[in-house]
Amino acid sequence: VISAGLNFPGELDSPYGGLYFYGGHTAEILTTAFGPDIISVKADVTAGNVIAVFKYASLGVCVNFAEVSEFHAALYGAKEVAVHSIDISTIYRQGFAKFVQGVLTRTPPEPYGTLLRPVQILNALVEAAQTGREAFVAPPLE
């Protein structure tokens, strides 16, 4: 994979907390698919949509945050491109199951660093969108 892109909902000026409302899902998609080691992010805001490029050591991932009804991801390779729909129909059921498991076992569903990582990523994204400059993402917690 030499590059990737995806779209997902997100509004910088959402009354529900801005990009943090849906952005956590996007950050989890990024860290699940490409790993937690995002170095930095650049963002552009046009007509209310945020387009961000998340920089890894050997990969750039473009995310279009826009209020659309379908979500897709694309992986770009040297010889082919793979495009796939992102199905979020079971996301709340999966999250609730992890929550219940955590309550029953009295253990967090993920290590604290994993739970905090989307917040670190979104903090940098909001900074980049507001300043128009590249923002560095805090290193993952161990």
At which residue positions do the language-model features occur?
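Rossmann-like NAD(P)H-binding beta-loop-alpha module
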Residues: 1-3
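A short glycine-threonine-serine/GTX helix/turn-capping micro-motif
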Residues: 14-20, 83-87, 109
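Solvent-exposed, non-membrane alpha-helical residues enriched in polar/charged side chains
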Residues: 31, 100-101
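Short, histidine-centered active-site or binding-site loop motifs used for metal coordination
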Residues: 8-10, 77-79, 103
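C-terminal helix-rich "cap/oligomerization" subdomain common to oxidoreductases
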Residues: 102-142
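Rossmann-like dinucleotide-binding domain that binds NAD(P)(H)
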Residues: 5-70, 113-120
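C-terminal substrate-binding/catalytic lobe of Rossmann-fold NAD(P)-dependent oxidoreductases
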Residues: 47-99
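A general structural signal for well-ordered alpha-helical segments in protein cores
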Residues: 26-27, 93-97, 122
